[in-house]
């Protein structure tokens, strides 16, 4: 069951999100009319599938090769499940990242800039506060009991709707790809943003 999070102060926006949550197709045109068209390079992109996220990530790494990317592999002591807390292989460089989990000095959806790498962890500067912190790998227990260790972050270029849950953004791109295929996916994607004017629709929404 989807529960409303009151991150929107714009009542019209909140009311239309509520209708969208319950499958009202007539509100789709309202979002097309009131959200921005195109793409913002300053915003993260929410996608319906891992495949589309992978396309965005590969393009970002290729276009920004000068950020000196390297691949950081997860460590685990058993078999992996379909649902992982963060990706098994993360490409990171001297670039902007987003946290995917809550920690003592950061929370899910926070952005930061990577400053340096060391054996002790990754030094980042938090975007909102300017504070410099060191981030270590986190360890999770998967549903099958496997211990899974990885950095709790991703490149700040694209994430799936699933990974975006619980996040709040001032600005976001939404790429529907071939369509949001699960009930409530579009609602979750649209409701991550505080205002409709912070939403950039890569493609116009379609009624299904």
Predicted stretch roles:
Residues 1-116:
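Conserved helicase motor core of P-loop NTPases
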Residues 95, 99-208:
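C-terminal accessory regions
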């Amino acid at each position: 069951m989807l529960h409303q999070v009151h991150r929107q102060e714009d009542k019209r926006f909140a009311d239309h999100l509520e209708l969208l949550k319950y499958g009202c197709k007539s509100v789709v045109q309202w979002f097309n009319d009131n959200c921005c068209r195109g793409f913002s390079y300053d915003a993260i992109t929410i996608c319906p599938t891992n495949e589309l996220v992978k396309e965005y990530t590969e393009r970002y790494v290729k276009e920004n090769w000068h950020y000196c990317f390297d691949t950081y592999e997860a460590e685990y002591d058993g078999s992996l499940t379909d649902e992982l807390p963060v990706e098994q292989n993360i490409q990171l460089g001297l670039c902007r990242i987003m946290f995917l989990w809550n920690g003592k000095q950061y929370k899910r959806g926070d952005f930061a800039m990577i400053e340096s790498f060391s054996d002790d962890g990754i030094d980042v500067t938090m975007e909102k506060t300017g504070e410099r912190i060191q981030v270590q790998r986190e360890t999770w227990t998967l549903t099958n009991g496997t211990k899974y260790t990885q950095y709790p972050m991703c490149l700040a270029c694209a994430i799936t709707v699933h990974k975006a849950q619980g996040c709040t953004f001032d600005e976001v791109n939404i790429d529907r790809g071939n369509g949001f295929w699960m009930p409530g996916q579009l609602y979750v994607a649209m409701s991550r943003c505080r205002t409709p004017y912070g939403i950039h629709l890569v493609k116009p929404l379609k009624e299904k």
